[in-house]
């Protein structure tokens, strides 16, 4: 989107935030991540990056239904090293688009929070002076995508056009979320995992192929060494439902996010149970 000046961009952002009932900061963050994504789609590396995580879920269900602050991708076709990632992102940031935004790489670090897949975190800055927005991109490798990534048509926030990127298929997104919820059991302190399963299935469940989802979940649990959840899920769900801590966390989450306020913790648990019963191995 071409804007006359930063004030005009801020006005667009403010209007979109009011329309979607989310904060202007979230809309600005998503707009700048979108600017990065368009550069990836125009780069020689467009077939090496596969979009996943919260940004993809937001694209699937709508920004007013699921907001996120960072970008998650997996890569294929080259070895994941600090040097390679710095070179690739420096090249991507150098791509010029008529959007007045300049991107720069600020830092590269290892992802420490999860052992699911090896990963690197890229810190970037999106500049449209005096606007400066810090961005985070997590890059992993070795992800289990079943059966394969898909070409996803991504609608832009302010322009009446789309960009094409590779992304996880719906079944793999759901499989990873289900595995996370069930394997972490009552130790999971992230209500959004429950929300994501619920909203994806509510809005996109009709498009989900049950046999593919079953296979995706089997392969994800094999990769993560959590195969027991496939048979133990009724007991796990009973523990989850009885957890006062998880209920309190959910109540806090639903107060914080407008889009979750009419969904109960039991609703999310019922959705997970329904999916698992439907794909019973």
Language-model regions, residue ranges each:
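Catalytic metal-binding/acid-base residues of hydrolase active sites
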Residues: 56
